[in-house]
Amino acid sequence: MTFVRIGQFNALPGTTDALRRIYETEAIPVIRQAAGNVSALLLQQHQSPESFMAITIWKTQDDAEAYDRSGQAMEMVAKIKFAFAGPPTLGTYEAYGIPKAA
């Protein structure tokens, strides 16, 4: 079963451009290279531009947990935490309807 993590957070005013640039150029490439990663993306809400969702999709829960244990997840959070208006929330989900990853 495909495993999805969704991190939700709000950014401080004036930090959204830098946060988006760092996540897109530094975090996403690292996450996508991790074993078992299917996709990684960052969503920014139109109605509230300080509101973000970071979504990672994994072949298995074990793959996501191995990425966490590697320390890379915390390194990526450290690069963008300057922009957090408060603590992020993390939800985990089983995904249905996603084409089977190779």
Identify the residue ranges that each predicted region occupies.
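Glycine-rich beta-strand-turn "strand-cap" elements at beta-sheet edges
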Residues: 2-3, 39-50, 76-102
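Short, well-ordered beta-strand segments in beta-rich or mixed alpha/beta enzyme
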Residues: 2-10, 39-70
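Short, surface-exposed ligand-recognition loops at beta-strand->loop->(often short) alpha-helix junctions
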Residues: 10-23
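Non-catalytic surface loops within mature trypsin-like serine protease
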Residues: 11-13, 60, 94-97
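An amphipathic, aromatic/His-enriched active-site/gating alpha helix that lines ligand/cofactor pockets
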Residues: 22-38, 57-91
